[in-house]
């Protein structure tokens, strides 16, 4: 759950990290923006803290069923990326269960809910190599760091 100001701040971070991770690959950038859009809509559906419109649901459907599968970067690296989609979804899904558990479960939930960020170093590896992957991995930890309970 976030305020409009927090969302605006997060959007700036997302714009920055996507440009860094995708480098000069516009299809990789488009792919990451699509994932970001889907992640935001799904989070809004789950949290029920922001109205999800009919248009949001249509966008989500189009991106998942048409735009991502036809994205050239995704198609070229589908074997790597699809497995990450499965892991991202599974990690986010279980984080929503663990958040209601004991203190240890809450810590796991805190980490697992943001597993979606792990796609960024992978995209950097695929577009710019190992060193950029390491840079993006460190940058993700800085940009999206949250205190426990946030």
Residue spans for each PLM region:
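All-alpha prenyltransferase/terpene-synthase fold signal
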Residues: 1-150
């Amino acid at each position: 759950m976030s305020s409009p100001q927090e969302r605006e701040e997060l959007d700036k971070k997302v714009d920055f990290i996507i440009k860094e991770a995708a480098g000069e690959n516009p299809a990789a950038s488009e792919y990451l923006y699509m994932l970001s859009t889907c992640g935001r809509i799904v989070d809004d559906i789950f949290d029920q803290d922001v109205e999800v419109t009919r248009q949001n649901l249509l966008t989500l459907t189009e991106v998942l069923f048409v735009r991502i599968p036809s994205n050239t970067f995704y198609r070229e690296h589908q074997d790597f990326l699809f497995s990450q989609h499965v892991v991202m979804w599974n990690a986010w899904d279980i984080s929503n269960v663990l958040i209601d558990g004991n203190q240890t479960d809450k810590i796991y939930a805190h980490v697992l809910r943001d597993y979606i960020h792990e796609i960024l170093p992978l995209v950097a590896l695929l577009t710019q190599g190992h060193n950029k992957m390491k840079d993006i991995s460190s940058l993700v930890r800085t940009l999206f760091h949250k205190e426990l309970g946030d």
